[in-house]
UniProtKB/Swiss-Prot annotation:
UniProt KW keywords: Activator, Nucleus, Transcription, Transcription regulation
Localization, UniProt: Nucleus
Organism name: Eremothecium gossypii (strain ATCC 10895 / CBS 109.51 / FGSC 9923 / NRRL Y-1056)
Gene responsible for this protein: ROX3
Taxonomy of the source species: Eukaryota, Fungi, Dikarya, Ascomycota, Saccharomycotina
Protein name as annotated: Mediator of RNA polymerase II transcription subunit 19
Keyword Ribosomal protein attached: no
């Protein structure tokens, strides 16, 4: 005679299977079968094999990203990180996620709460979290590597498209001669503020 279990005596790790329900059907094809043979992929498998039958190296499928772009012009540097020893402690600070909104403590007034919201990220840019000496060192490394990209572009009033003197003409022309500035690049792939400027800058005066 079988033992009858109710909900009170049945262990929680048992589950009920309805005999009237649909029967279980095993997965097809079985993942433990030789799927290469099942689907007739032997030829493709031999073409993309990493090693030959005798153990020698065959086709190299994977290439590093640097090898894929080596035919492009320009210089490509390793991003400074803590692991490669080029960025020190700066990378985890720059790329870390912030916690979001500040926590409103009990008894905090409206003005205190507003200041907490305004300055909630201030600690990220102060010691010991941010090492500004390390930031200056990393920037100087890029300046030495890409002097053409980090040269002092300078700011000139004629860069603004405003009628500053009320004459109806902007500052693009000084002394009756149009001043053209060229932004030269050394072929670097780095994005700099003036790297996308055309050689002949055309400015429009705002009406």
């Amino acid at each position: 005679m079988g033992t009858v279990h109710d909900d009170a005596t049945m262990p929680s790790y048992y589950y009920y299977v309805d005999p009237a329900g649909p029967a279980y059907e095993p997965q097809q094809p079985n993942p433990i079968d030789d799927l290469i043979s099942v689907y007739g992929l032997q030829d493709i498998s031999r073409q993309v094999a990493r090693t030959n039958a005798d153990g020698t190296k065959a086709v190299k499928l994977r290439k590093s990203y640097k090898n894929q772009i080596q035919d492009l012009s320009g210089k490509f540097s390793v991003i400074p990180t803590r692991e490669n020893g080029k960025g020190g402690e700066i990378s985890p600070i720059v790329f870390q996620n912030t916690d979001g909104d500040a926590v409103r403590e009990r008894g905090m007034g409206p003005e205190e709460w507003r200041r907490a919201q305004v300055f909630r990220d201030q600690a990220l840019f102060e010691a010991p979290t941010m090492d500004w000496d390390m930031c200056a060192e990393v920037i100087s490394q890029f300046e030495r590597s890409y002097p053409g990209e980090f040269k002092n572009q300078g700011f000139e009033v004629e860069d603004l498209a405003f009628d500053l003197d009320g004459s109806g003409a902007n500052g693009a022309a000084l002394g009756g001669k149009a001043k053209k500035r060229k932004s030269r690049s050394n072929g670097s792939s780095m994005a700099t503020p003036n790297s996308d400027l055309q050689e002949d800058i055309k400015r429009r005066r705002l009406e």
